[in-house]
Amino acid sequence: MEYDRAAKFSSNKPITLFRYTLVLFFAFTATGSEQLKVLNYNVFNSHRHGKSYEAAVKWVNTVKPDIAGWQELVGWNEAKLKKLANDWHHPHAAALKSGGYNIGLTSRTPIEVVARHQKGFWHGYLHCRTAGLDVIVCHLWPGGVRQQMGEANQLHALVTRLHKEGREVILMGDFNAHAASDKAWMDKQQPLLERRSSGDAKKRPEDRFIVNGKYTFPIMNRILEAPLHDVVRTKFDIKHPKPTQAQCLMIASYPTRVLGHVKTVELQRGFLERIDFILTTPSLAKRCISAGVAREPAVLETISDHYPVIAVFKN
């Protein structure tokens, strides 16, 4: 997220949060060679310009992902990513471009770069093959619906083609967009809606994300048609068929309390949203064992303004 580094739960929910994150911790750490663990993480201007890098590496090494997608590797090139990826035991790495707001992929297994694509994107996407999968890491621009839809259409076309070819695909990243499956709880995020509405109203009508005071969902709707499955939401719905608002906030991926306007749990609660996703083609989704947004330990409140997303699959 860039245009608004804009919750957690109310203070009477600490036990619920602890239990939820404890379950995720064991699901995400008890993997062996028969499983594949995937991490997506927007690291906020290269770990807050390096200030949170050591804490980030320490946390990643507790999770032990097999594949990791990264956004906001600001100023990093591929050589730097390859060097630093050894800190979390990933000997293979690829980056979208030579600098700027970069996108990266690191892996325990060799990476074949299929495409580094920027045309028609503000940032772009990195398409690679690793661990027998097509892995696409993206970062969508939050400025307006038309630009985002152009980016979404390109991702839709790419995944549709790969799916028809029989490829298993992971599309992950910071989408700066919301899923229609989150509408019920997003409609209640009034502080967030109020914060965004004034800026959104200044855009041309066709570029507005908020209509009649509520978020719309054209971007993720288009991407999910590819077809792709939102594995975090799927696993959440199985566990919580009739979720409360507080339970829904457990899958929010942004913002952490590192940002000034959400310094407390009480303030943060009204601004939580889910804009970071791990999406997969149907056959791979069937092999998903667990998926969620890591909201603990507390160090995640200081590493980035985003929370990481993790999914585990049967190999």
Sequence positions of predicted segments:
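N-terminal, active-site-proximal structural segment of metallo-dependent hydrolase catalytic domains
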Residues: D4-R5, S11, I15-L17, L22, ...
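Short, Asp-centered acidic motifs that coordinate Mg2+ and/or phosphate
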Residues: L36, I67, E168-I170, F277
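Catalytic metal-binding/acid-base residues of hydrolase active sites
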Residues: F44, V74, W141, F175-H178, ...
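Active-site neighborhood of phospho(di)ester-bond hydrolases with catalytic His/Asp-centered motifs
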Residues: A68-Q71, I170-D174, D230-R233
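Structured beta-strand-rich core segments of catalytic domains in phosphoester-bond hydrolases
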Residues: W70-G150, G292-V293
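Metal-dependent phosphoester-hydrolase catalytic domains
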Residues: R116-H117, R161-L162, S181-N315
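His/acidic metal-ligating clusters that form di-metal
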Residues: M149-F175, T216
